C-alpha cells in the first residue's frame, strides 16, 4: 500500500518572523499515523494546538493564518508547501511566536530541515482527496478551480505589469508525475514591491522583510543583487504558495488546479467550496502502490531528492 509519512527525529531551527521581525524558534517532531499536521503555540501560558484544516484558516490578507481560541500561527504556506512536496502526512510543528519564520522566502529551508530529520513511512495507508467534478471560485477577474485529474498538476497565471516580471513569463504549469518539487518549485522566493513594503512597515508589518528573504522590486527593476533562481521565479512562487494553501485541507489532492491571479484567500475559498459539495470529492487510499498516481509514487517524492 501507499503509506503515510512522518519524520524520523526532532529537528529545530531559528529564524525571523516576516511581519514581527522577531526571532522565532521552530521545532518539528515526528507524529503518529493519522495525526495530520498540527501546529502548536508553545509560548502561550497554555499551549494551543491547531490542526491544519481548511476551516482553521482565518486571516488571508498577507499570508495563510491558522486560528483557534484566539491563538494564531501566520505564514504557514511555505512550510505546508514543503510538507506537500515531500509527502509528509503527520507532523508536530511547535512555534514560540505567532508566525512561522520566513527563512529565505522560499520553501527550500523547510525542505532541507525535513530531509535532515529523515523521512520514514508509517504502517498506515495514505489518504487522498480525489476531485470528482470541477469546483470553481471567482472574485472579479481572479479565479481558482479544481478539476478531476488522475495525478497532481497546477497551472497559474499572474498579471503584474512590471518590466522585471513581464520578461520572465506570467504563466507556469507543472505536472508532478514527471517533475521534481524540490528542484523546480521549492527554491522560488516570495516577492514584493518596495512601495508596498514601506506601506506595510508604517502599519507595523513586514518588519522582518529584507533582500535576504524576498525579491523586492521598485518601479523598474529588481533591487536584489543576485540573479533570479528560476527564469520565471515569480509565477513559480505563486505555485509554491498554492501547493501550501491547498495542503491545509489535510490530505494530498488528486486533481488539477488552475488559477488566474489567485491568492491565499481565494485558494481557501476553493477548498471550502470543494468540501461543501459531497459529490465533488471522495477519500481514497491505494492498497497497491503501482495503482496510485505517478505524482505520489516514492520515486516522485523521494525522501532525498
Curated annotation (Swiss-Prot):
SUPFAM superfamilies: Ribosomal protein S5 domain 2-like (SSF54211). One of its GO terms (molecular function) is UDP-3-O-acyl-N-acetylglucosamine deacetylase activity. Coiled coil: none annotated. InterPro entries: Ribosomal_Su5_D2-typ_SF, UDP-acyl_GlcNac_deAcase, UDP-acyl_GlcNac_deAcase_C, UDP-acyl_N-AcGlcN_deAcase_N. The active site is at residue 264. It catalyses: a UDP-3-O-[(3R)-3-hydroxyacyl]-N-acetyl-alpha-D-glucosamine + H2O = a UDP-3-O-[(3R)-3-hydroxyacyl]-alpha-D-glucosamine + acetate. GO terms for biological process: lipid A biosynthetic process. Its cofactor is Zn(2+). Zn(2+) binds at residues 78, 237, 241. Belongs to the LpxC family. Catalyzes the hydrolysis of UDP-3-O-myristoyl-N-acetylglucosamine to form UDP-3-O-myristoylglucosamine and acetate, the committed step in lipid A biosynthesis. This is UDP-3-O-acyl-N-acetylglucosamine deacetylase. It comes from Cupriavidus taiwanensis (strain DSM 17343 / BCRC 17206 / CCUG 44338 / CIP 107171 / LMG 19424 / R1) (Ralstonia taiwanensis (strain LMG 19424)).
